């Protein structure tokens, strides 16, 4: 008698828990009530990749650019970690327009990005903020992925919202 409703309730609870929702079941004098709540996080960065695609190979000396699409206007800072674990900023506060794909091919219109050693896998992170960063978070001297990510989060903390996206490529001779 109770097996079917209990199974249905368990299935419903599983669906909501997998969807990241909170389920509250409360007994009332003559009936049970079920309410749900959820938080939906919309990413500001909808696309981020190098011009040859995520995971592509580049030779030392090749030009490289990055395609980015955001849901709102703001600024992007690009940082990277080399195969040896060194972290660096190579573009800060690049303005982007929301709702359109843009190409970032240099820190300014007259400067481009060029592949340089060391060879091996590289990871680039785009940090989106609604306003300009002040540069107070320093990435020079930071080594290792976890410390890099902690610095990015520290930089984003000054803003009511922000987003991070990563892409990877390999550098060869």
Name each region found by the language model.
Residues 21-173:
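Secretory-pathway glycoprotein ectodomains that are cysteine- and/or Ser/Thr/Pro-rich
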Residues 9-20:
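Bacterial N-terminal signal peptides
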Residues 2-10:
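Bacterial N-terminal signal peptides that target proteins for export
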């Amino acid at each position: 008698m109770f097996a079917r409703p209990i199974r249905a309730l368990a299935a419903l609870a599983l669906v909501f828990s997998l969807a990241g929702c909170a389920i509250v079941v409360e007994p009332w004098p003559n009936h049970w009530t079920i309410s749900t709540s959820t938080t939906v996080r919309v990413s500001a960065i909808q696309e981020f990749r190098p011009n040859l695609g995520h995971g592509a190979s580049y030779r030392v000396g090749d030009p490289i650019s990055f395609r980015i699409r955001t849901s709102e206007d703001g600024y992007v800072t690009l940082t990277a970690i080399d195969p040896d674990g060194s972290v660096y900023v190579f573009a800060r506060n690049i303005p982007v327009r929301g709702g359109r794909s843009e190409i970032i091919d240099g820190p300014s219109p007259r400067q481009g990005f060029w592949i340089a050693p060391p060879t091996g896998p590289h990871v680039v992170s785009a940090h989106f903020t609604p306003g300009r960063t002040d540069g107070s978070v320093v990435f020079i001297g930071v080594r290792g992925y976890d410390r890099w990510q902690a610095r990015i989060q520290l930089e984003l903390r000054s803003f009511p919202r922000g987003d991070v996206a990563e892409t990877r490529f390999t550098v060869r001779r």
